[in-house]
């Protein structure tokens, strides 16, 4: 008998389009070709006073398969995902599929992901390429995409990171490679490597998963639609927290990558010399990424003053210990 597996959605309604985006997301889950799904929506203390009533109405549509949890205070989408993952564990789900509230899953997403996990029991994380849509659900042409998104798509089409050491190429070559709404993880893996940070929490978690020995698998067909409203600069997170996003992103990436090198070194997968070279290459790649996103002062700091990068990494390591 096929078990139910769980779509995990953090929800924070803080703009006028949130209700429509949420409904479109839920409809995409209800349209899955594989009927063995559950959906857990974790509301992050949305400022929209109508959000609670709206979510309860969605749950009432299919209370056996759709559940909503309401956080008593705003904790960030990473913590909300952790709450959803723990709920999935309690009902015995083998894996979770992350799906942000403004993104859309293809109808065959669950079917394709289940097939990948069954095909290779060693795989712990599955991700795919994606289609970019605007606020109206219309596909965004490539020339209108920001450089960071184009870089992700280029890296995927050339040679998407996969296998047991995906963290190395993600950190030193491609940068962020798997959008959260395209990513599915075995529940046990998601429990072992929870989301920690408020910014770039997904990137940080993927580094730790891969560095901890989790095998990544990549599906070349798009399984999700990633929404970028045309009148909002950057992601919803970036619009909300402003320029501090880039500093937080830098710290989260450094923390995740150095955690991966520490774990790989501890397992004997790499020696200290290779670890130092990987860390150097990581800072060079991070500088390029920050510059592409317009964070030029941070990019200069990372690239031209290597000691700052080392100091940042050392401070992050101290904070973790």
Where are these regions (language model features)?
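Conserved nucleotide-sugar donor-binding catalytic segment
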Residues: 153-240
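A conserved acidic beta->alpha catalytic loop
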Residues: 43-54, 73
């Amino acid at each position: 008998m096929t078990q139910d597996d769980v779509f995990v959605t953090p929800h924070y309604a803080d703009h006028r389009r949130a209700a429509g985006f949420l409904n479109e997301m839920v409809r995409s889950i209800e349209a899955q070709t594989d009927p063995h799904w559950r959906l857990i929506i974790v509301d992050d203390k949305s400022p929209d006073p109508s959000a609670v009533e709206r979510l309860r109405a969605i749950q009432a549509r299919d209370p056996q398969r759709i559940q909503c949890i309401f956080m008593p205070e705003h904790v960030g989408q990473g913590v909300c995902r952790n709450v959803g993952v723990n709920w999935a564990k309690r009902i015995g789900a083998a894996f979770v599929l992350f799906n942000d509230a403004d993104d859309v899953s293809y109808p065959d997403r669950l079917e394709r992901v289940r097939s990948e996990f069954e095909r290779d029991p060693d795989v712990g994380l599955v991700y795919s390429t994606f289609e970019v849509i605007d606020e109206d659900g219309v596909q965004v042409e490539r020339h209108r995409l920001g450089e960071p998104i184009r870089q992700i798509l280029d890296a995927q089409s050339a040679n998407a990171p996969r296998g047991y050491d995906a963290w190395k190429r993600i950190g030193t070559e491609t940068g962020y490679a798997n959008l959260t709404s395209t990513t599915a993880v075995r529940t046990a893996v998601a429990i072992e490597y929870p989301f920690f940070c408020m910014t770039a929490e997904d990137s940080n978690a993927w580094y730790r998963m891969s560095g901890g020995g989790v095998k990544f698998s990549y599906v070349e067909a798009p399984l999700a639609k990633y929404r970028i409203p045309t009148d909002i600069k950057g992601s919803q997170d970036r619009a909300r927290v402003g320029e501090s996003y880039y500093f937080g992103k830098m710290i989260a990436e450094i923390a995740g990558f150095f955690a991966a090198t520490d774990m790989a070194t501890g397992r004997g997968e790499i020696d200290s010399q290779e670890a130092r070279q990987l860390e150097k290459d990581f800072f060079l790649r991070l500088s390029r990424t920050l510059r592409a996103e317009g964070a030029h002062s941070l990019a200069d700091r990372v690239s031209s003053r290597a000691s700052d990068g080392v100091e940042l990494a050392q401070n992050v390591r101290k904070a973790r210990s």
